[in-house]
Amino acid sequence: DMGIQIHTVVGNHTAYYKDTNEINTIDLLLKQYDNITTYAETEEIKLGNLSVLLIPWINSENEETSFDAIKNSKSKVAMGHLELNGFRAHRGHVMEDGMDIDIFDKFDKVYSGHYHTRSDNGKIYYLGNPYEMFWNDVNDPRGFTIFDTETTDHFHVDNPYRMFYNCLLYTSDAADDIPG
């Protein structure tokens, strides 16, 4: 036992039903571990001396309580599984059907999953996937993010392994046109 505590929020792919977070794969698979806490509802927690608002997937069941918690939070940092407008969901697609970001103006920093690629506006940070999943992920940096609870700084650790590569095929007729 290394004494590591894991805090995780329910996301849209871990919730079994689209309108509730109550039944989710994180609880079902990992509830026997004492060091893992799953958040199916929005909740403020302390990480060291830092208060952080954790926001799971917002759905019809928890929408009102989630927005109330966001509005009333005293935390300076929020972390969640959010679907916000104006960020790249994946290469070639910027989200336009999500939530407005204005509700998060009160926070110094917001970190989120959900979108599969990294993007940010200087205040809200989408962390992306730790690994490539689809062909359109090629050459899109993947990895994980380290967050410092004392300074609220973060940095990305890139995954050095890739699944997808761009390959160019030249026919023998075109080979004469290749420089070098």
Q: What residue ranges belong to the model's regions?
A:
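A conserved active-site cap/scaffold subdomain adjacent to cofactor or substrate pockets
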Residues: 119-120, 125-149
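Charged, glycine-rich active-site and insertion segments that engage polyanionic ligands
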Residues: 155-167
